[in-house]
């Protein structure tokens, strides 16, 4: 007999002695109950024959659930069950269990369940990647083992706070053969939902873990999470009641005690994006903070807004003075940001801007593009431009005007406000002044001054009318640091604008065809009147400048549609063709002189009717 054979026989004898000392009958021999002897014999067996997997499992049965024992069992997994089958020991007699460190004891009855038990202990010892790799090697054929693999993978994700992955392991609609696994999984899913801020769903899901109290530890976590969800939604009295219930069930459950002692104690909330941004997928502390994530997201959006604002401004026809002023403000803002970064003093300046000129000349478009630029430069938080006017802010009583203005401005913080026809804020005809206008202006002044670092106000209207309104309140005039003038579109610019608007939908308006509009555009431009305040108002201003041109083009398209409604159109619609030549499409893209002339006539008639 070789030394190896002798060691193997001695290991088998030690295994038998250990089983007998564990109360398990072998070969008809009477067992005893001596745990110390059993543990010693099983340890001897693994020393004599490390390849005997069942000897390692027997050490688990004897209570030796160290990492080394599980590692030894897994290293010898090729011989799983050999010795117990040789000795005629059944699974009911020989059933080692391993704690998952959280809720349950996992029975080791197969190779896959051994992998799960080992992975659970690896995860408990923060060897997360090894645990994940081990679970990846499993290919369970038995449905109970498949459930166990899912459960332990969920435990791994729960320990590492990978909440979306926890929810993926424990979908609500999935039936579980092991009710204990279902209850523990529900507790983990409850925590995941609450940590993602889905409080109502978390509160409801918790009932799966609480009902029946199958797994007390899981029920405690579910009750605790319910209490914290109630706290997050402002139902403090109910929250405290649940937290006390948890503490009465388990005084060692420290989160409940801490939450009771500190009313400001809250769950740590996160989101899937932050979890995915971790440098180490298993380490929650390697993720950027919510503030850092928000800053990165804001930086990404800022670049987008800056590019959009620049593109929109550059695409506008004419308005060279306006573009120059906006670029100057943008440059000043960038320099001030650089000075602040260098620790140099930066003057506190407002960016409130007066946009003076007739309607339809691009004031609103410039305000939107400028707001995007400021958002892109991180001066503003959002590219929101709230459009308002005196009419929108007035109420039945003077207090209504003040309240409406305050609510509008409060909702605009971080963005911009565009006051259309701002010169109408203060109206004439009141013997003691305009109380409604004063209420709006006084509220506006407070926000323009106190929130000038997070709010931009644009005031739009005619120049002389605006000047007279500002004379009523010099404080308001001083708040506007920039004045940009806009002018009526010239006949040539109106022609260029017509062609540009046609291109937006891939329509074709040639220079020759557009010239049919020039006499009318010239007449509208040269038609001059003066307002009561002394502002020059041209005929094209009354029509709406760019807005009028857009209406001309739209009406021209309507006429083209009517013109094209013939047999050829029906033939196109009824054919099976999916590709068309440039010549065929040109008929549907071209706006003719007739279309434009009819569009002009219809647009003028509509304006007169309105």
Curated annotation (Swiss-Prot):
Family, as annotated: Belongs to the CbxX/CfxQ family.
> Would I find Ligase among this entry's keywords?
no
Which sites bind ATP?
357-364
**Has keyword Plastid?**
no
**Which branch of life, at top level?**
Bacteria
- State the oligomer form and interacting partners: Part of the ESX-5 / type VII secretion system (T7SS), which is composed of cytosolic and membrane components.
The record's function comment reads: Part of the ESX-5 specialized secretion system, which is responsible for the secretion of EsxN and a number of PE_PGRS and PPE proteins. EccA5 exhibits ATPase activity and may provide energy for the export of ESX-5 substrates.
PANTHER family noted in UniProt: AAA-TYPE ATPASE FAMILY PROTEIN / ANKYRIN REPEAT FAMILY PROTEIN, AAA-TYPE ATPASE FAMILY PROTEIN _ ANKYRIN REPEAT FAMILY PROTEIN
Record localization: Cytoplasm
**Cellular component per GO?**
cytoplasm
Name recorded for this polypeptide: ESX-5 secretion system protein EccA5
Q: Name one GO molecular function term.
A: ATP binding
Matches recorded under InterPro entries:
AAA+_ATPase, ATPase_AAA_core, CbxX/CfxQ, CbxX/CfxQ_RuBisCO_ESX, P-loop_NTPase, T7SS_EccA, T7SS_EccA1-like_N, TPR-like_helical_dom_sf
Record's keyword terms, sorted: ATP-binding, Cytoplasm, Nucleotide-binding
